[in-house]
Regions:
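Surface-exposed loop/turn motifs in large extracellular/passenger domains
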Residues: 1-10, 19-37, 45-63, 71-97, ...
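Beta-rich catalytic cores
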Residues: 15, 40, 66, 101, ...
């Protein structure tokens, strides 16, 4: 979808307020997902190998119990990129919130690859103000940040990023040219 807005959609007792993708492929370019709400993935859920390729798109004020904007599970993959130049280029996660984990993104047993120009700012959750990563039993979560900015995100634990692994699970992370600025955690 190019130039598309998903606004104020609600999944009352389930996942993916805006989009539910189980094994499908989503492409978002120059779009907006704002004020969507769900139990998991206020804007989007990726499960069963579902993928999302996101370029120059804004996720703002989405809310969920887990994953204010994205809930990623069962080999789901989120990739962001910048297709333009200037201050508005890149993908923006702004003011998303989760009552429990992952203000912007919750990933368990999946992959998050945030490319150059991706900004996560003002997101909030109890654990992982911007991102919560969980390596579930005998599975893994993979995080890659390249040219990513984390600013003014907040949480009780992990103002920007919180990761945890269950027995037999792993969380793998790689980062280059990343800026963490003004993120806060009240308990560590």
């Amino acid at each position: 979808a190019t130039g598309t807005t998903f606004r104020k959609n609600v999944a009352t007792s389930n996942y993916g307020g805006g989009i539910y993708s189980a094994g499908g492929s989503i492409v978002l370019v120059d779009s907006r997902m704002e004020e969507n709400k769900a139990a998991g993935g206020g804007a989007i859920i990726l499960a069963g190998g579902g993928t999302a390729s996101v370029t120059d798109t804004a996720f703002a004020a989405n809310t969920a119990t887990n994953g204010g904007a994205f809930f990623i599970d069962k080999n789901g993959v989120l990739t962001t990129a910048s297709g333009g130049v200037g201050t508005d280029a890149g993908t923006l996660f702004d003011g998303n919130s989760a009552t429990t984990n992952g203000g912007a993104v919750y990933v368990q047993n999946g992959t998050v690859d945030l490319g150059s120009g991706t900004r996560l700012q003002g997101n909030q959750a109890a654990k992982g103000g911007a991102i919560y990563a969980l390596g579930g039993k005998d599975a893994s979560a993979k995080l890659t940040f390249a040219g990513t900015v984390f600013g003014k995100n907040s949480g009780t634990y992990g103002g920007a990023v919180y990761s945890s692994a269950s027995v037999g699970g792993t969380v793998n992370a790689a980062a280059s040219d990343v800026v963490f600025e003004g993120n806060t955690a009240t308990s560590g």
